[in-house]
Amino acid sequence: VESLGGKFLTVEGSENLETEGGYAKETSDEFKKKQEELLSETLKKIDIVICTALIPGKKAPIIIKDTMISEMQSGSIIYDLAAIQGGNTSYTEVDKIIVQGGVKIMGEMNILNKLPISASALYAKNLFNFVSNLLDKKTGKININLEDEIIEKTLIK
């Protein structure tokens, strides 16, 4: 998220919100109030939201309230990865795009099955670019330029 310019929202005085398995767990009413205030103000200013809050064995918590969605900018997108368990908005529907007040709510059921193809293509592209960097462009022969930052950082010394 951060490598793409996104930011995680952190509620001040956060409790430990994860189980050992990395899932969200139930939070206190005080935390929920702080979270709602932070989300409400933040959502008015941003274009893309990615929701992932899941609680094992339970319906996903509704963390983006209807009133928050109504105050978002038209054209904004909520990408709800918790759709399989009901979603983090009340509008989320599995494998559907719902438009509510100009905001698109995308309820992706199984994003993980779609990632391997993209990840493989990205890895192949990165590997190709790295190996291409080892070649002299004029002669086509291997030329390990130790002054190239990428090559220098990948050498085992």
Positions of PLM-derived features:
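Glycine-rich phosphate/diphosphate-binding loop of Rossmann-like nucleotide-binding domains
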Residues: V1-T42
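Conserved active-site and cofactor/substrate-binding residues in soluble primary-metabolism enzymes
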Residues: S3, E30, K34-K45, I63-T67, ...
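Residues at the C-termini of beta-strands that transition into short coil/loop
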Residues: E12, A82, M109
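Short gly/pro/ser/thr-enriched loop/turn and capping motifs at secondary-structure boundaries
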Residues: N16-E18, I84-N88, L112-K114
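Glycine- and other small-residue-rich loops at beta-strand/loop junctions that grip anionic moieties
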Residues: S28, A53-G57, P116
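ADP-ribose/adenylate-binding Rossmann-like module
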Residues: I48-M106
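Adenosine-phosphate binding glycine-rich loop
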Residues: T89-K157
